[in-house]
UniProtKB/Swiss-Prot annotation:
Pfam families: EPO_TPO
Gene coding for it: EPO
High-level lineage: Eukaryota, Metazoa, Chordata, Craniata, Vertebrata
Name of the protein in its database record: Erythropoietin
Species for this entry: Alexandromys oeconomus
Signal peptide bounds: 1-26
Localisation per UniProt entry: Secreted
UniProt record similarity statement: Belongs to the EPO/TPO family.
Source domain of life: Eukaryota
Alphabetical UniProt keywords: Disulfide bond, Erythrocyte maturation, Glycoprotein, Hormone, Secreted, Signal
Amino acid sequence: MGVPERPTLLLLLSLLLLPLGLPVLCAPPRLICDGRVLERYILEAREAENVTMGCAEGPRLSENITVPDTKVNFNAWKRMEVQEQAVEVWQGLSLLSEAILRGQALLANSSQPSGMLQLHIDKAISGLRSLTSLLRVLGAQKESISPPDATPPAPLRTLMVENFCKLFRVYSNFLRGKLKLYTGEACRRGDR
């Protein structure tokens, strides 16, 4: 019953600090660069999209929610600096997180049956938090902060969704598109 061993103490400390988004000593710094990690989140997003796919008319949101536009002009994307890509991905991920949380609140206040839908919302929230932490370790948050004398980034393009089907489609498309493109490029360049 003495003092815990040092590795155990470090593990406990890292588990406490990880949700805060602080750098953790034990966390593999380039975990997001392992394609299997991102593919797991993409698979969860696709499952949520598929569950709600037959829902052109429902389950509806009681208000429209703003989400990031997921369209990618590949030629323009390739010409962008990694810092510009980081800004777009970081802003998009933040807006998407807000949108999913808003969807969760609207579902909780509705009379719609929510069992399976709530499960996928909870998975999406957990996945977005994990992806945010992994992007922080990769340095996306630092890259998305422009110096005071820099030209401000272009405003994030957005669109409105009115049902959970479209919300999960945007979530899935964002992960498969901009997030995957950014992490692939940042990992290839070795940016941190």
